[in-house]
């Protein structure tokens, strides 16, 4: 597997030089963050991004992400033009030698947590999701803002888009996803780009919005929408495991068997036992609810050689910055995963 690390561009306090010094680090996962959603990423901008990354001695491994415009998810008449733009971006990425794109189909909100700096017993700060707190939150009132969210909405715009989604149930969202997939994947095949849909995080409905990339059955349904290795998935074990009904390792094995794992996010979470509430933990198995050794072993047993990255980290050793995306704990996670991979490989001999 190819160890990679999320980088938020030159405004990120975690620099490429920092990342390059992490043992075993090979690639960067990033995006172009200042192009409005729905517009085309030019080859010139992609080329510059690739040059910037490669100048640090790393590879531009994955784009995470090319966001999908809400009009596409809503199935509005404007979607065809927006999908045309999306396809052109995919073609431009392929032409510049960037061949994996992670994206999601979550309505309105990206990953969602209820506390960004919860203090764990060891004194570190972590992201958590409290199901009861989430039930009482009203996103229209702007009660919470997270790094993955589109912060450009006014309150009136947020109310309007939430009203539009009140008419979109899960089956209707499936229809819109299928429409998108059947247009984008043939172009991705021609461009040599593997698409990798990220799970909904957490993988169940929040704020009354439909969510569909949530469980094993829905993953199988998704990959069967279009039978191609280019129509693949990002297996984020931490996202899937945050629903107690999911077996994240079994879901990973199912997608590996189907040759659809195009990207991996490997992080741990600890289910608190209070409904679907969870805490994001340190990466090692003993701190969470996921057997991380079995995750890496499944990848090894399938001879999987794709990109993997440590995901959200705690804030430790006094570090501050973007919640979940500091340097120190993610670097620990990367070296832990690297060590697991070595142990699994040697035990297999």
Language-model features and meaning:
Residues 65-72, 104-113:
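Aromatic-lined carbohydrate-binding surfaces of glycoside hydrolases
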Residues 1-4, 9-18, 51-54, 71-75, ...:
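Histidine-acidic metal/acid-base catalytic patches
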Residues 12, 22, 40-61:
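Glycine-rich, positively charged N-terminal anion/phosphate-binding segment
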Residues 31-47, 109, 207:
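Glycine-rich, proline-tolerant flexible connector loops at the mouths of alpha/beta enzymes
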